[in-house]
């Protein structure tokens, strides 16, 4: 009986907390811009993730309409080695250069850089998968910053 009461009370509190998904259709309407054209150069994996996140803004044309040219690079840097010369710590650094055009005229240009440090793994397959996941997460962070910057361009 106590479990049912606890579950019921928990359900009431959680349902009224006001949670909304960040990229819901309702929240994308808060940003009064659209993207008419996207072009990408550079790291394919990062570009695909950015394109996936920006697709919400290409659906309908609004008053403020941007054309984006995105150039991305990603590099893996060795931070530390052990006595045998094997790498023990790495850092993935992702840099995205964005040219924002409005009506065929350069409106803004900015660079967003993110990095993440991690330790080596003896299982190379798991290490590769972990690196891919890190790159995807960095691309998500960069995309969130990009959307915020686009919303603030006057």
Please state what every model-predicted region is.
Residues 1-17:
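Sec-dependent bacterial lipoprotein signal peptides
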Residues 14-34:
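Bacterial Sec signal peptide processing site at the extreme N-terminus
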Residues 20-27, 112-120:
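Mobile beta-alpha loop/short-helix "lid" or hinge segments that flank ligand
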Residues 37-40, 125-137:
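Second-shell loop/turn segments in exported
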Residues 39-67:
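Post-signal-peptide N-terminal segment of Sec-exported extracytoplasmic proteins
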Residues 51, 61-62, 66-109, 115-132, ...:
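Surface-exposed short loop/turn segments
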Residues 130-152:
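C-terminal partner/receptor-binding element of secreted or periplasmic proteins
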């Amino acid at each position: 009986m106590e479990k049912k009461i606890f579950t019921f009370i928990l359900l009431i509190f959680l349902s009224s907390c006001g949670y909304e998904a960040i990229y819901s259709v309702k929240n994308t309407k808060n940003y009064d811009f659209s993207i008419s054209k996207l072009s990408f150069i550079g790291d394919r994996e990062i570009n695909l993730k950015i394109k996936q996140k920006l697709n919400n803004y290409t659906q309908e044309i609004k008053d403020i309409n941007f054309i984006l040219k995105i150039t991305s690079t990603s590099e893996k840097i060795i931070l530390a080695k052990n006595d045998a010369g094997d790498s023990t710590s790495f850092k993935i650094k992702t840099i995205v250069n964005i040219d924002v055009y409005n009506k065929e005229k350069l409106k803004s240009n900015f660079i967003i850089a993110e990095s993440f440090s991690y330790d080596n793994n003896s299982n190379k397959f798991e290490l590769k998968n972990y690196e891919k996941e890190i790159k995807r997460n960095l691309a998500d962070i960069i995309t969130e910053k990009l959307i915020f910057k686009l919303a603030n361009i006057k």
